[in-house]
């Protein structure tokens, strides 16, 4: 399974892996899995990032429409990816690709 491989290799993950994972399992699940693997609670992540817990929950659930706007969403995702030690640029890129795919369906 992708998650098992990712989980085992998390400490040594390279940017290629984070991009591949974000595209395979989705940005929401990638961020959640990374947070859990680093043993942070959602509350701790929200407190550290200075972002309301409800917004991080929305990101982890893929409910981007509950966020205050596209600019905020990209910044929240970028900061969250940095926080969990993923390549932020690639995670944001995967998010934009997800959104584009949703809009064309």
What does each model-identified segment do?
Residues 1-37, 43-47, 82-105:
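Low-complexity alpha-helical segments at protein termini and membrane interfaces
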Residues 50, 61, 96:
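Positions that flank functional sites
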Residues 35-36, 69-75:
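Short acidic alpha-helix initiation/capping motifs at coil-to-helix transition points
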Residues 53-70:
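Recognition helix of helix-turn-helix/homeodomain-like DNA-binding domains
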């Amino acid at each position: 399974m992708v998650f098992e491989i990712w989980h085992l290799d998390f400490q040594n993950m390279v940017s290629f892996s984070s991009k591949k994972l974000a595209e395979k399992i989705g940005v929401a699940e990638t961020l959640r899995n990374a947070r859990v693997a680093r043993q942070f609670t959602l509350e701790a992540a929200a407190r550290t990032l200075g972002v309301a817990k409800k917004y991080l929950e929305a990101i982890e659930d893929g409910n981007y429409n509950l966020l205050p706007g596209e600019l905020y969403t990209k910044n929240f995702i970028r900061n969250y990816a940095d926080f969990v030690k993923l390549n932020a640029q690639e995670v944001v890129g995967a998010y934009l690709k997800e959104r584009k795919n949703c809009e064309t369906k």
